[in-house]
Amino acid sequence: MENEVNAGTASSSRWNPTKDQITLLENLYKEGIRTPSADQIQQITGRLRAYGHIEGKNVFYWFQNHKARQRQKQKQERMAYFNRLLHKTSRFFYPPPCSNVGCVSPYYLQQASDHHMNQHGSVYTNDLLHRNNVMIPSGGYEKRTVTQHQKQLSDIRTTAATRMPISPSSLRFDRFALRDNCYAGEDINVNSSGRKTLPLFPLQPLNASNADGMGSSSFALGSDSPVDCSSDGAGREQPFIDFFSGGSTSTRFDSNGNGL
């Protein structure tokens, strides 16, 4: 019997709001009441009892639950708004047009594989700076082919080869080409590197012919012009010093090149 009484009391204490009660509570919420005080709860409860059964705690919990539901609803509406905005923007979004500065492809360095050898070792051509793509006046792109790169490499190698310094070992001289104190220019020799040196002593014999009948050459060391060997002492006897045999023997010749 007691259990039935408790069940009836519990069922009777459960609040089932009527439509008029909900309408009145929502109007109060819209007026700005969010957390009513104890006096406000008693006043609201007295007004709502005219429309049905209600207690003070029912009024308190209704405002708490309604406030939480409104916050959740506003959060969902904001999320839905941002999702629609993002979807709409992504559909009609286009990247900005490329300018002549921002859309140029990056540079890369390419080292020439060809090399030239001289007395100091290998001499490589300078590194080349290429672009994979270049802008043309119409605003489009022009692709550089491998053939164009190879042609440019070939042109630069040719230019580098023409500017290579001549090795001193490549200059050939006649042992019997120069006469004593008879040099091109003002007794100054210019080597292949462009540096001027003074002749300290004669390096070659003077106006002499070898046993095979080879004549004297008119080419001087480091000079592009012929050597004028018409000196005053053409008729006198000239000594011949052999610097290449390693000996110290000095042989004298007459004006015709015959040994004395």
UniProtKB/Swiss-Prot annotation:
Residues 10-74 bind DNA. Keywords: Developmental protein, DNA-binding, Homeobox, Nucleus, Transcription, Transcription regulation. InterPro entries: HD (IPR001356), Homeodomain-like_sf (IPR009057), WUSCHEL-like (IPR044555). GO terms for biological process: apical cell fate commitment; cotyledon boundary formation; cotyledon development; embryonic pattern specification; longitudinal axis specification; positive regulation of cell population proliferation. One of its GO terms (cellular component) is nucleus. Disulfide bonds: none annotated. Its main location: nucleus. Gene3D superfamilies: Homeodomain-like (1.10.10.60). PANTHER family: WUSCHEL-RELATED HOMEOBOX 1-RELATED, WUSCHEL-RELATED HOMEOBOX 2. Belongs to the WUS homeobox family. This is WUSCHEL-related homeobox 2. It comes from Arabidopsis thaliana. The gene is WOX2.
